[in-house]
Amino acid sequence: MENQCLPKKVPGFCSFRYGLAILLHFCNIAIMAQRVCLNLTMVAMVNNTGSPHLSNESVVEMLDNVKNPVYSWSPDIQGLILSSVFFGMVVVQAPVGYLSGIYPMKRIIGSSLFLSSLMSLLLPPAAQVGAALVIVCRVLQGIAQGTVSTGQHEIWVKWAPPLERGRLTSMTLSGFVMGPFIVLLVSGFICDLLGWPMVFYIFGIVGCVLSLSWFFLFFDDPKDHPYMSSSEKDYIISSLMQQASSGRQSLPIKAMLKSLPLWAIILNSFAFIWSNSLLVTYTPTFISTVLHVNVRENGLLSSLPYLLAYICGILAGQMSDFFLTRKIFSIVTVRKLFTTLGSFCPVIFIMCLLYLSYNFYSTVIFLTLANSTLSFSYCGQLINALDIAPRYYGFLKAVTALIGMFGGLISSTLAGLILNQDPEYAWHKIFFLMAGINVTCLVFYFLFAKGEIQDWAKEIKTTRL
């Protein structure tokens, strides 16, 4: 709305909307820690020197007694276990996209976070039973985590002023990289000192505590918040007046299918999650096979990309909103800029990793940069749907996430198959495929992305003569 309608003084960082971003930040840390911890503990859980067993039964080796049980799972089984979380995430996207605009997000996100944490607590005993039960736990965890990661975007339709979207969403989404940083940093030490099962117990308990906090601290609509100042309420409501004035109408499916700006977002979501899932899932494996380090050193090295990614994500949020508030660039230019940085920079550093990494240090540097620069996309295509169709944002995020999850599922599973069949040239094939997908989708985005609300996303007003 017009600037004169907005309050002159509103709380900045010390406000409830930023408090909500921090709360979601910690929730995202929890679900990512629960998802990623298996990537590193798998190194300690599996006997790579023993004969593989393709059955669903876990063969326990007498190693370190109960503290560190070891199983003989083949690379195919390991790849299926690691990627099974994406099966659950894929299944839940469409229902969450529909329900997020109907049911309170307090219940949806709070209960889903609790379910994910419960599955983390149950995973060590499930491993004792067999690989099949581990896969079941991971699928259920994927359903819960997909609900949290997709449903939370609907929150910002009512809570994020347009000129603060970059900062609020980047602060929230940066939890997705801080989670892996924390879990990879400490999991190696936990495995050595307490055994790998304690990794799942610790992060499961943390998630349970956060889910209870969510029920007490979150309110679906800022106008219903009992402790928020009237100035902050007026600021949020006034800034969102244009897009929040009308309720959700029937979905313009045909118009959506014909929308090239929407397809640009969808394809780049596919490329982003393909790359992100691949690097998150297989960075510990790459470090173990290429650099030949122990579990503790593996965890430390695997955590470095996420620390830098966290910094890049926060920096991207500040920069994008700075460009918009100072009117240096238009919305579409900002989205294209950060999408390009988040898609093309990882490709450059992956190629450097394959052809210019001559020693231990150069390998670590290029791998760290390839992982971390993905987070520039937080202020690019990942929030572009909020620009072009705020009224359907929850549904569109579910659709883009659904198609993106297929990318994550395919990349994780395919990488496991390639590593099993062609160990010598596997990483070249895996990374070249990732680079090709990133560049192709980026070109499409650069040609067709938009920053203004599309005609099919505007309220239709009928006039009678």
From Swiss-Prot:
Keywords for this protein: Cell membrane, Glycoprotein, Ion transport, Membrane, Sodium, Sodium transport, Symport, Transmembrane, Transmembrane helix, Transport
Subcellular location: Apical cell membrane
Transmembrane segments: 79-99, 117-137, 176-196, 199-219, 260-280, 304-324, 337-356, 363-383, 399-419, 429-449
Keyword Membrane annotated: yes
Tissue expression from the record: Kidney.
GO MF, one example: symporter activity
Matches recorded under InterPro entries: MFS, MFS_dom, MFS_Na/Anion_cotransporter, MFS_trans_sf, Pi_cotranspt
GO BP of this protein: phosphate ion transmembrane transport; sodium ion transport; sodium-dependent phosphate transport; urate metabolic process; urate transport
Membrane topology recorded in Swiss-Prot or TrEMBL: Multi-pass membrane protein
Chain positions carrying an annotated carbohydrate: N39, N47, N56
Cellular-component GO terms for this entry: apical plasma membrane
Superkingdom of the source species: Eukaryota
Catalytic activity: 3 Na(+)(out) + phosphate(out) = 3 Na(+)(in) + phosphate(in); urate(out) = urate(in)
Quaternary structure (record): Interacts with PDZK1.
UniProt family annotation: Belongs to the major facilitator superfamily. Sodium/anion cotransporter family.
Cited function: Important for the resorption of phosphate by the kidney. May be involved in actively transporting phosphate into cells via Na(+) cotransport in the renal brush border membrane. Plays a role in urate transport in the kidney.
Protein name, UniProt field: Sodium-dependent phosphate transport protein 1
Species: Mus musculus (Mouse)
Classification of source organism: Eukaryota, Metazoa, Chordata, Craniata, Vertebrata
